[in-house]
UniProtKB/Swiss-Prot annotation:
Localization terms from the record: Early endosome
Function: Acts at least in part as component of the WASH complex which may regulate wash nucleation-promoting factor (NPF) activity and is required for its membrane targeting during endosomal sorting. During embryogenesis, not involved in the wash-dependent developmental migration of hemocytes anteriorly from the tail.
Keyword set, alphabetical order: Endosome, Protein transport, Transport
Main location: other
Keyword Protein transport found: yes
Protein's name in the database: WASH complex subunit 4
InterPro entries referenced in this protein's UniProt entry, alphabetically: WASH-4_N, WASH-7_C, WASH-7_central, WASH7
One Pfam family here: WASH-7_C
UniProt organism field: Drosophila melanogaster (Fruit fly)
């Protein structure tokens, strides 16, 4: 217990501390966005990383060579590595730039002059200030790109000026790295020009300078102005023009001997880029789906033109035609780029002889062609799903059997996984970009294809993450195996080069191969492999080597490159640096489509992948947007759907016995989601979302609330809880609510406050000690018994009995006032006085043995002639109801006393077997212990007092009213016993009619018993001291004689008919006699029950 308390306190402290940190983080306006952008990849809890440290310079392990050719290769390799690092960082910054408008959240126009508009605009400017650090980093990044591009051109010019045979292959690799940087500069330029920041920049500068004038020195203002001018170059100006201006300085440094080789290589590179752009002529939307090729080609052509490098006229014409065909290229969902406008702005001389311009902002595609693309995407998605399933099975099989005997298969599986991930990523981005370029909204099927592709990416990522230990063990061996192959091929190639006749070329080739061997001997990091690619690129296209060796070297290099970066590529397909388009487009995914797609997932594995990828992308968006995503995640949607669906399933199963048997039950296609309950937990922002726990909590709360609202239907919810446990394997917590059976129901306090309603709407059974509701709107009748009262007494304490008796006393006062008013009425009092004179005159005569039946019947008929109420009841019926309500109130007192005894009897289990005295006497005990002993003895004494029969509430109720009702002034009450015969006759008629109604339908207010009348009658007779006078009437004897006379009269009629015509008995007469006899028997039965109840009731008041 002590350890549990410590853990509970520690947990509450951590929760409170976490809440304070989250609150503080939400309140801080200046949240560093770029810091979060650098830590995007969410690694698992335990991750094994076998990648080498790429930050180590690869040339540290190289030996300095005497040949000059080694230094250009090393320099170009380092510059290409820097280009790759800058590109990876640029992708992260581009995604953060895309969400910069969301962070501003400027919903009010700048010209609003109201206080709310000023406050909203100032808030946007404050958030803009918090992003200045991020814009500074982007500015530094772009400046670094300009420096790298200058160094690249300078190094290329220096390399080609050396009189050596440098092949085009490694120059093309340098041009590829350069084009990639140019692409990122164009993207940053368009993002800045088409964002809200550029429109608000002038206002922001004015606001910032006004804010700083009163609080800053001149030196600080000068520094601020300089910084703002630098950032303004990024946001409002053409940064690509700044790049071209910086490159113009290099034009003066180019010598005549370097211009011609650069021109030759540049034209060859442009020619190759044109072939890549037009590689798939069947898909005319290829460059819209993946616009990087046309962006790189256009930017490279502009840079070459700006440097004054001569391009072939045919190449220029082809480039202009290509640009004219692509008016607007989508960079992402909200930013477009115009290649023709870009060329017109930066290379006007090339556009002078431009081809015919095409109207329209985008390609015109017929709906049938678009439908063809949609069907092709769905078919490709299905094929990728099948291939990934087979790939994952084969990968697991290789791990189970052992990799060392299947290194070739293992290598092929890794490369296939890498290829599948690239295909999935490209297909998803291409589908989105195609719709953006065509300006057509994505349909539900398109979003479902994108969601399924995201699941495929998560499947590949999980396959590699779940087998990290095996990859660490086997990939090292695999790399060693491939390295030995590469080294063997290098030795073979070296032997081939020895036969060359040109000494200088032979020395250069041998030195390059030697450097490649030294590079490949270490761990094949990206820096090392970049150098190897550039080094081997010098003779890959050389015709002196055999074609088979060239092909094999290309294949081996490609595999080594893929394996060296396999963990980053596969694990990073959902990372922002690899697929920023997917992350940004996931923000626009419609919640209704995501909800519909999640409802289609009936496999826990696919559901888990969808929830995991949704969490991953939402988490990345929250980092870049600076706040949580307001949309519902896939986990919330699936939990909401499963909760509603499984609740409906449990309701149907619980009520299945009410359904009729179906003729064809197998035609109903009911979806089974039970397997989704066992989906594995998914981590999100430090919390693990477990679908099973959410469902158990939902059903626990639902069953509790429904049982509280409708306690009469507690069995249905208990059955649903049982089905949830047995069928769904869920364990909802028991609600521990009292079930509404005989010993549970309406609370005693509620009855006490509504005693007038209770006495009129419940019927009392003296033998069973229960009250039963006479009329109810529901299907069930409420029953209140001894155990129910005992439970209420245990809940509220025994003191509630005295309070309830006081309420009943007040209720009886009202009823006795009505009782006295009725007997004081002149119509009633005069007739009772007449009956009193008759009874007084004849009670001593021998012929007068009992009160005549005829006089009671006549008295009842005269009362009936006085009139009826609105619902057809006579005054005698209303008076009988008053007596019954008085009896119900007295019977409820008896039920309370019995329930109190039952509760005290239950409490005896806490009492010791021996009547020991716990008083300490002279012993010294703690004060708290002594106080507990006193409270225990006090409670025990109170229980004994309540359990004993010393308190007789019937006598208290008699003594409370007798002084007033037996007052000589209330002489009209002395004749009450004379109305009892008529009152009993009215009661018997009422009970007989009630029991006849039981066999009829649609009858309300029917009761099998009503012992409250007998108790009320005996209670009033005892209170008025008229019990002896009532017995002197001998009414039971009168009723017996009357019923015997009626029965003999029926027999005489039947005997007379038999004597007159014994052979011709009337059938109708027989039926009439049978009905009359049955009626007499019913009256006799009711009279016997009444007199038995009256005799039992007299015992209570003795």
């Amino acid at each position: 217990m002590f350890a549990e308390d410590i853990l509970r306190d520690y947990g509450s402290f951590i929760s409170e501390h976490d809440g304070k940190l989250k609150l503080l983080r939400d309140k801080v306006p200046n949240r560093d966005v770029s810091e979060s952008a650098q830590c995007v990849y969410m690694s698992p809890v335990v991750e094994v990383n076998f990648m080498g440290n790429d930050s180590m310079a690869p040339d540290r392990s190289f030996e300095e060579s005497e040949l000059v050719a080694n230094k250009p290769l090393t320099t170009l390799a380092n510059l290409c590595n820097q280009c790759r690092n800058l590109s990876r960082k640029a992708k992260r910054f581009q995604l953060a730039f895309l969400f910069s408008d969301f962070r501003l959240d400027d919903t009010l126009p700048p010209h609003t002059h109201t206080s709310e508009g000023s406050a909203g605009l100032e808030g946007s400017l404050v958030r803009m200030s918090s992003s200045m650090d991020f814009f500074c980093q982007v500015y530094f990044l772009l400046n670094r790109m300009i420096v790298i591009l200058q160094n690249l051109w300078r190094q290329i010019a220096a390399s080609v000026s050396v009189p050596m045979d440098i092949n085009e292959v490694h120059i093309f690799a340098v041009f590829d790295a350069m084009s990639e940087l140019l692409e990122h500069i164009v993207v940053f330029n368009e993002l800045a020009n088409q964002s809200k920041i550029s429109t608000m920049w002038a206002l922001y500068k004015k606001w910032l300078m006004n804010l700083s004038n009163s609080q800053s020195a001149n030196l600080e203002l000068n520094g601020l102005s300089t910084s703002l001018m630098d950032i303004e170059n990024l946001i409002t100006k053409d940064f690509f023009r700044i790049l071209l201006d910086n490159l113009m300085e290099l034009k003066k440094q180019f010598g005549l001997n370097s211009v011609s080789p650069i021109t030759q290589h540049s034209n060859a590179y442009i020619r190759r880029q044109l072939l890549d752009v037009d590689a798939n002529p069947s898909n005319e939307l290829k460059n819209y789906e993946d616009p990087k090729h046309i962006i790189r080609l256009t930017t490279f052509v502009v840079v070459v033109h700006e440097l004054g490098i001569q391009m072939e006229g045919k190449l220029v014409k082809n480039v202009i035609d290509l640009v004219a065909r692509h008016k607007q290229v989508p960079l992402n969902r909200s930013v477009f780029w115009s290649p023709s406008g870009f060329l017109s702005l930066h290379a006007k001389t090339l556009m002078k002889s431009s081809a015919r311009s095409q109207d329209g902002q985008g390609p015109k595609v017929h709906s049938t062609v678009l439908e063809k693309f949609r069907l092709s995407d769905q078919r490709t998605c299905r094929q990728l799903g099948v291939q990934l399933s087979l790939w994952s099975i084969q990968m697991q099989r290789v791990f189970d059997v052992g990799v060392f005997g299947h290194l070739k298969t293992f290598l092929q599986l890794i490369l296939n996984g890498h290829s599948y991930a690239d295909q999935v990523n490209l297909l998803a981005v291409a589908l989105i970009n195609r719709h953006v370029a065509l300006m057509t909204p994505m349909t539900r099927n398109d979003w479902i294809v994108v969601s399924r592709l995201l699941q495929y990416l998560k499947v590949i990522q999980k396959t590699f993450e779940s087998n990290q230990i095996n990859f660490v063990r086997f990939i090292s061996s695999l790399i060693q195996w491939q390295k030995q192959k590469v080294i063997h091929l290098l030795h073979t190639t070296k032997k081939k080069i020895v036969v060359l006749k040109l000494l200088q070329r032979k020395i250069n080739f041998l030195a390059t191969i030697k450097l490649a061997e030294k590079s490949i001997m270490g761990f094949p990091s990206k820096q090392r492999l970049t150098f190897v690619n550039l080094a081997l690129g010098e003779f890959l296209d050389n015709r002196l080597l055999p074609a088979d060796n060239q092909k094999l070297i290309k294949s081996i290099l490609h595999r080594v490159n893929s394996i060296s970066d396999i963990m980053r590529n596969i694990g990073g397909q959902l990372n922002t640096s690899e697929s920023s388009s997917l992350v940004y487009n996931h923000w626009f995914l419609d919640t209704s489509v995501l909800k519909e797609y999640t409802e289609l997932q009936r496999n826990p594995y696919s559901l888990q992948n969808l929830v995991s990828v949704s969490h991953h992308l939402d988490k990345i968006m929250a980092m870049f947007r600076g706040s949580r995503c307001p949309k519902q995640s896939a986990n919330d949607l699936i939990i909401e759907f499963l909760s509603n669906h499984l609740e409906f399933f449990l309701r149907v199963e619980a009520l299945s016995h009410l359904f009729q048997s179906q003729d064809q039950p197998f035609q109903q296609s009911a979806l089974d989601y039970r397997l989704c309950i066992n989906a594995v937990a998914v981590e999100n922002d430090g919390d693990y979302n477990i679908i099973k726990d959410h469902l158990e909590n939902y059903f626990t709360a639902t069953f509790y609330n429904l049982t509280t609202i409708a306690p009469h239907d507690w069995k249905s919810y208990e059955k649903m809880r049982h089905l949830a446990n047995k069928v769904l394997q869920l364990q909802p917590i028991d609600d521990h609510l009292p079930n509404q059976i005989i010993d549970q129901g309406i609370d005693v306090l509620q009855i006490m406050r509504n005693i007038h309603t209770f006495a009129s709407s419940y019927a009392y059974n003296m033998n069973l000690q229960v009250f039963v509701e006479t009329n109810s709107r529901s299907k069930h009748l409420d029953i209140i018994g001894t155990r129910h009262v005992a439970n209420s007494v245990q809940t509220h304490g025994t003191g509630i009995i005295n309070t309830t008796v006081n309420f009943i006393y007040q209720f009886l006062r009202q009823k006795f006032y009505t009782f006295s008013t009725f007997l004081h009425d002149e119509q009633i009092k005069s007739r009772l006085l007449k009956e009193l004179r008759f009874h007084t005159e004849h009670k001593h005569s021998k012929s007068y043995q009992s009160y005549p039946y005829e006089r009671a019947d006549s008295f009842l008929k005269k009362i009936r002639r006085l009139g009826c109420s609105s619902n057809g009841e006579t005054y005698m019926d209303l008076f009988r109801k008053v007596i019954t309500q008085v009896g119900n109130a007295v019977g409820y007192v008896r039920l309370l006393q019995a329930g109190s005894k039952n509760a005290n009897f239950r409490n005896r289990s806490y009492k010791t077997r021996f009547d020991s005295n716990f008083s300490c006497g002279g012993s010294k005990v703690h004060e708290a212990t002594e106080g507990s002993i006193r409270e225990y003895e006090k409670s025990l004494g109170h229980m004994k007092e309540c359990y004993s029969d010393s308190t007789n509430y019937f006598k208290l109720l008699l003594q409370g009213f007798q002084p007033f009702l037996c007052n000589p002034h209330n002489h009209h009450l002395r004749t009450f016993y004379l109305i009892t015969p008529a009152l009993i006759m009215n009661y018997i008629d009422y009970r007989v009619k009630q029991k006849l109604k039981i066999y009829k339908k649609d009858q309300t207010k029917i009761s099998l018993f009503e012992d409250g009348f007998a108790i009320g009658l005996v209670y009033i007779l005892n209170m008025l001291n008229q019990q002896t006078e009532f017995h002197e009437l001998g009414w039971s004897q009168t009723i017996t004689q009357h019923l015997n006379a009626e029965r003999s009269k029926v027999r005489d009629i039947l005997a007379g008919q038999q004597r007159t015509a014994p052979e011709q008995l009337d059938e109708k007469l027989h039926q009439t006699v049978a009905i009359t006899e049955r009626h007499v028997n019913a009256y006799e039965h009711e009279y016997n029950l009444l007199y038995a109840t009256l005799s039992s009731s007299e015992i209570f008041f003795q």
